[in-house]
Amino acid sequence: MEDSPLPDLRDIELKLGRKVPESLVRSLRGEEPVPRERDRDPCGGSGGGGGGGGGCSSSSSYCSFPPSLSSSSSSSPTSGSPRGSHSSALERLETKLHLLRQEMVNLRATDVRLMRQLLVINESIESIKWMIEEKATITSRGSSLSGSLCSLLESQSTSLRGSYNSLHDGSDGLDGISVGSYLDTLADDVPGHQTPSDLDQFSDSSLIEDSQALHKRPKLDSEYYCFG
């Protein structure tokens, strides 16, 4: 009876990251397991039932086997067939592969959920950053407008206060003469306007003419009366 072909274990080794044990490979091949040092004959014999070439008899007190080892050695070689052990090993391997596939599916689903959560967190961070930038821009604009308005109000109040103080301040050295001279200069600029100095000159000339006329009239009367 031919054995089924041995499955390729390289994919399993790559997924698990470790090499498949030799005992599992031998069990899949249908080979008998290699006995360990403790399972061998302590007296150097072959472990069979013959007494000729063993160098030690089973009835000897120095080479007596424990009951568990003797029972296992008597039942293990002939109890199970290689075909049954091979099928049981394949079933165990398929079960482990199925569990491994399920774990990989669960890991992928978890990875997808984590990626979605990271995307949501990233979008939230970007929206918060945008809101902070917009708020900073609006605040800077409002502060600049309020600063310009305050500076304008301060300049207006300062100019009005300065003009009011200049009007009501008598310590600037102005007197009536300086004000009159200033008014005279303004009147010179206006055509046809007579200044107080012009009026004074007019009144002086009229008085002189009147006095001259009064002095001339008696002379005429005296001359008239003389000739008469």
Curated annotation (Swiss-Prot):
Residues 44-56 have a biased composition (Gly residues). InterPro entries: LURA1/LRA25, LURAP1. Keywords: Acetylation. Residues 57-88 have a biased composition (Low complexity). Pfam families: LURAP. The modification N-acetylmethionine is found at residue 1. Residues 8-21, 28-42 have a biased composition (Basic and acidic residues). GO terms for biological process: positive regulation of canonical NF-kappaB signal transduction. Transmembrane segments: none annotated. Residues 1-89 are annotated as: Disordered. The keyword Phosphoprotein does not apply. This is Leucine rich adaptor protein 1-like. It comes from Homo sapiens. The lineage of its organism: Eukaryota, Metazoa, Chordata, Craniata, Vertebrata.
